[in-house]
Amino acid sequence: MIRLETEHPVAIESPDHIAPVGTVDDNTTDIDYINAVKNHFNNEQIRVLDLGCAGGQLIADFISRGDIGVGLEGSTNARERGAGKHNWDEYGDKNLFTVDLSKPYQLYEDDEKMKFDFITTWEVVEHIAEEDLRVFFEQIRNHLKDDGVFCCSISVVPDDVGWVDGKFLRRHQSVFNSVKWINLLFDCGFELAYDPSWPPTPVGIQYPHHPGIPEGVAARPQGLFFGYLFGDAMFRMHTTYGNSIFFCLKKKV
């Protein structure tokens, strides 16, 4: 049995809860992406964690492949009226849970702390306020196996809600360039998990906190890729045309 322990079951201050869009509309999955992840792990059973899972279809599809999947979502709107409500009806409080991802939490499986082979979060990180990012990444590091992979995409364009009840809301609360992101990720205990067989295209950017020039960096029409392990397979959460940065990371040794 899987259970979640937290004092913050809902991200009540998040613009994505107050003025929901993705948490209600999104229930995206991608079989090519799942296949690429499975191939990377030699098609063995893996433990997968999806942060900002919305309707939970990605996790439902991993589970249907025989994997152990958990999805975490910040807003109850996904469960109550989202596009993936049927997944929440089936997997809610078993594989899908709500939690404020910017606060401490711990997942357990049969009362043992869970560790995951693969943690993924697409177009979610930029929704976390800058002052909460270190706690956000600390939870990921705590739940990642020592040889696990953390994969994310981060949008670099603004997304403003506007004025709601006298307060200006901004969905994308952390919009930085690749230099700031990679320095922050290294400072939070991650390093690139690149595939040496993937030919990089150097982008000529300096990363002061990184020892030497990062390897496995490529510039493509969709955006900048850092250590990306899955070739052309990208989870189709959003259509991106140079608007995102993609990272595949592992724990820093």
Residue ranges and their predicted role:
Residues A129-L133, V161-G162:
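Short N-terminal helix/helix-N-cap motif within the alpha/beta-hydrolase-1
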